[in-house]
């Protein structure tokens, strides 16, 4: 099944965080918090301004984004958990450095 969000909504798949701390301590599942980082899976067509003109979204499919702890609505599509949120719930886009892109 394909899901297409409406207006200024986006579908985000959470990106799992590291299982270990920088010091090498393994974090058990019970102590983990849900990650606040994800990848954009689908985007809506955009919002409309007062005159009815369509305003495109700043994020696109494939972007890695940061969002608030309580942002979005959790849904399960084809057995996979996603978040549906408005673009305004996204705090920013993570951009890979040029060295990481080359590798």
Curated annotation (Swiss-Prot):
It comes from the Bacteria. Keywords: Chaperone, Cytoplasm. Its main location: cytoplasm. One of its GO terms (molecular function) is protein folding chaperone. The keyword Chaperone applies. GO terms for biological process: chaperone cofactor-dependent protein refolding. One of its GO terms (cellular component) is cytoplasm. The keyword Cell wall biogenesis/degradation does not apply. It is found in: Cytoplasm. PANTHER family: 10 KDA HEAT SHOCK PROTEIN (PTHR10772), CO-CHAPERONIN GROES (PTHR10772:SF58). Heptamer of 7 subunits arranged in a ring. Interacts with the chaperonin GroEL. Together with the chaperonin GroEL, plays an essential role in assisting protein folding. The GroEL-GroES system forms a nano-cage that allows encapsulation of the non-native substrate proteins and provides a physical environment optimized to promote and accelerate protein folding. GroES binds to the apical surface of the GroEL ring, thereby capping the opening of the GroEL channel. Belongs to the GroES chaperonin family. This is Co-chaperonin GroES. The lineage of its organism: Bacteria, Pseudomonadati, Pseudomonadota, Alphaproteobacteria, Rhodospirillales.
